[in-house]
């Protein structure tokens, strides 16, 4: 099949452009100390700093490939001749880094890429003293019109040939000195996926056939149909760099079968969450997590994909139907806080939108024919931040606590929000008073991603603050009681085993106390436990709720208790099948079922994390989900466009 049409050449050029973007991101990660590589910087014009999320993503990618290389070196250390065949190598510095580490030994590196990419790389190497000094025996081929070998040396060979042209690749590699029977690591780092699937399958097949003593290391995307996957695919479509294999091989199982069917005896497929948590030492994860301020845990977990060892036990019931809120305004914000001021009136504060931190509080108001959004004319000390809490209090007001303006600047302010009866309300704006509450006693340290829950105890009203994180503490487990009548942080007697430290969890009023569920725990591992803070005559007691079957661990979800059922919506989990829908937990019996969401009526990829939610009626039969989304790695920012509603009646009417 011909692969040199004008249209294909345009696509090839677009794919080559992904190399330039990738190497800039790798240089950024190296410059921030994620990994050591003094040679990458020689392949870019200048060092640019990428966002922490991108740096972490490229670190995991680099570390995973490096792990496979070291395993290969160890397994073949007794062999006199070993080879690395890097397909679509681009401006990778693999050879130069390994040479500097003294890790090559008897290893020869063969790099293959499009002729134009190889030509540019050869020119960079030949013009850079640091690079060419590592190749004292190099031979630069002058006539590159007739010879696909651009640089030849004893341990490094740079070849410019289209890997889809099997016969040409075979002839050129043989001419460059590749020994087909020698132990060889074939490396494809986000390369084959840009080819039409029949071509990438052919490459996997000929590698198995021609290199009988080889291992094939492939780093590639999976999960095309979840919201992140849809955003990622749209990004590459805009770049004219379609990801092809993703549709036919959407998960680790399909990729495993692919390699077996193409002639490989064994295939081990591991996603990057599994690699990050199971193969990296905790000390190394702590080192990396301390390099830069970071607060994008949802997208980081989604980006690394899924741990396939735990599958949700979906209930054999129809998915819950969700749909955009009737005549709802556009609210594209993540990390907001919400509170129900009165039936049909929802206050929204804080968060981050497309233009940065959202400085405008707003109110959603239910009318006869739909919902409208009114701006808030704030009087007093409004606090702007992300991941603050806003808790409804008796009388129609709310209390705002904590949050952050940046990962280095959290707050511990307590702000009382009340309506201002002295001012007339207009159709387009609502008058609210934001007043800092001066509190006595020892309060919690500044934090965000915590929970604040209203508890009534012995004729007093308390705001119960639990968990979260600070700029120095990755997770917190302390608990604090603020008496709203006395404006005093009160010491209360609490017995029982304290829940594990966490953030991005949920806490719901229940049984005179509250119930906490899930969150992100120590070391970045999602949790699936539930704890009941039960009132006693002398204070409170923590009790563990035994759930069966255990729900899939998750964080950045939302939850509400309706009667004896805790309804957990959305969030992020690190497992293979789909994305979180609704978990229904019976707090009396401990039974738990997972129910999927039918998102077919929502015309955009629905990302249910970093969002807020409220029940819309006293029976709890309908829930509204507002905001949510985030930065999708280097693929752009995706924010949910409109609030959506979930009809909870099917699950409330059933006995789970």
Each model region followed by its residue ranges:
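Rossmann-like AdoMet
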Residues: 1-159, 166-167, 174-181
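Structural motif
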Residues: 83, 108, 183-185, 215, ...
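Short catalytic micro-motifs in class I SAM-dependent methyltransferases
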Residues: 88, 186-193
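Conserved, structured regulatory domains from eukaryotic proteins
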Residues: 115-117, 131-135, 143, 158-171, ...
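A short, conserved alpha-helix within the catalytic core of class I
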Residues: 164-173, 194-212
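Conserved beta-strand signature within the Rossmann-like core of class I S-adenosyl-L-methionine
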Residues: 185-187, 206-225
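Rossmann-like AdoMet/SAM-dependent catalytic core
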Residues: 228-325
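Kelch-like beta-propeller repeat domains
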Residues: 310-656
């Amino acid at each position: 099949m011909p692969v040199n049409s004008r249209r294909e050449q345009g696509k090839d050029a677009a794919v080559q452009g992904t190399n330039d973007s990738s190497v800039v991101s790798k240089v950024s990660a190296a410059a921030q100390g994620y990994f050591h590589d003094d040679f990458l910087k020689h392949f870019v014009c200048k060092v640019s700093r990428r966002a922490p999320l991108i740096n972490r993503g490229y670190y995991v990618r680099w570390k995973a490939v490096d792990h496979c290389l070291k395993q290969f070196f160890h397994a073949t250390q007794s062999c006199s001749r070993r080879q690395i065949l890097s397909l679509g190598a681009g401006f990778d510095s693999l050879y130069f880094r390994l040479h500097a580490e003294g890790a090559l030994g008897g290893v020869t590196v063969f790099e293959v890429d499009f002729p134009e990419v190889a030509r540019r790389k050869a020119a960079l190497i030949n013009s850079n003293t640091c690079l060419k000094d590592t190749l004292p025996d190099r031979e630069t081929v002058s006539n590159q019109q007739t010879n696909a070998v651009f640089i030849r040396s004893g341990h490094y060979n740079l070849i410019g040939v289209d890997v889809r042209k099997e016969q040409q690749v075979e002839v050129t590699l043989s001419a460059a000195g590749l020994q087909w029977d020698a132990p060889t690591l074939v490396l494809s780092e986000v390369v084959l996926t840009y080819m039409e699937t029949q071509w990438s399958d052919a490459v996997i097949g000929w590698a198995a056939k021609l290199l009988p003593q080889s291992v094939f290391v492939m780093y590639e995307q999976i999960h095309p149909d979840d919201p992140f996957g849809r955003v990622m695919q749209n990004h590459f479509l805009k770049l004219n760099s379609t990801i092809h294999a993703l549709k036919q091989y959407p998960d680790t199982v399909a990729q495993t079968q692919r390699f077996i069917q193409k002639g490989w005896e064994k295939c081990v497929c591991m996603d990057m969450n599994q690699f990050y948590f199971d193969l990296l030492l905790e000390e190394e994860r702590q080192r990396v997590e301390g390099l830069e301020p970071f607060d994008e845990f949802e997208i980081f977990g989604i980006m690394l994909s899924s741990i396939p060892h735990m599958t949700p036990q979906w209930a054999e019931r129809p998915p819950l139907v969700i749909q955009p809120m009737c005549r709802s305004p556009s609210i594209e914000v993540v990390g907001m806080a919400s509170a129900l001021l009165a039936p049909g009136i929802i206050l929204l504060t804080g968060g981050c939108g497309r233009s940065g931190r959202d400085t405008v509080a707003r109110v959603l108001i239910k009318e006869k024919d739909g919902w409208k959004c009114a701006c808030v004319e704030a009087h007093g000390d409004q606090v702007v931040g992300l991941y603050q809490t806003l808790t409804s209090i008796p009388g129609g007001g709310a209390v705002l606590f904590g949050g952050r303006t940046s990962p280095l600047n959290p707050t511990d302010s307590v702000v009382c929000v009340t309506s201002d009866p002295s001012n007339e309300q207009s159709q387009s704006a609502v008058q609210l008073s934001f007043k800092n509450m001066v509190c006595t006693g020892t309060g919690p340290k500044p934090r965000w991603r915590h929970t604040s829950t209203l508890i009534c105890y012995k004729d007093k009203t308390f705001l119960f603050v639990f968990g979260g994180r600070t700029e120095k503490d990755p997770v917190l487990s302390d608990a604090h009681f603020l008496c709203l009548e006395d404006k005093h942080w009160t010491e209360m007697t609490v017995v029982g085993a304290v829940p594990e430290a966490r953030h991005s969890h949920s806490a719901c009023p229940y049984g005179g106390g509250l119930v906490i569920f899930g969150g992100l725990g120590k070391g970045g591992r999602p949790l699936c436990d539930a704890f009941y803070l039960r009132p006693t005559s002398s204070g409170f007691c923590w009790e563990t709720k035994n759930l069966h079957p255990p729900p899939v661990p998750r964080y950045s979800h939302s939850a509400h208790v309706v009667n004896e059922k805790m309804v957990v919506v959305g969030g992020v989990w690190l497992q293979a099948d789909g994305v979180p829908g609704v978990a229904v937990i019976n707090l009396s019996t401990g039974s738990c079922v997972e129910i999927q969401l039918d998102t077919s009526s929502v015309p955009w990829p629905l990302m249910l994390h970093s969002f807020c939610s409220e029940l819309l009626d006293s029976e709890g039969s309908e829930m509204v989900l507002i905001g949510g989304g985030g930065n999708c790695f280097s693929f752009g920012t995706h924010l949910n466009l409109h609030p959506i509603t979930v009809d909870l009646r099917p699950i409330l009417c059933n006995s789970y």
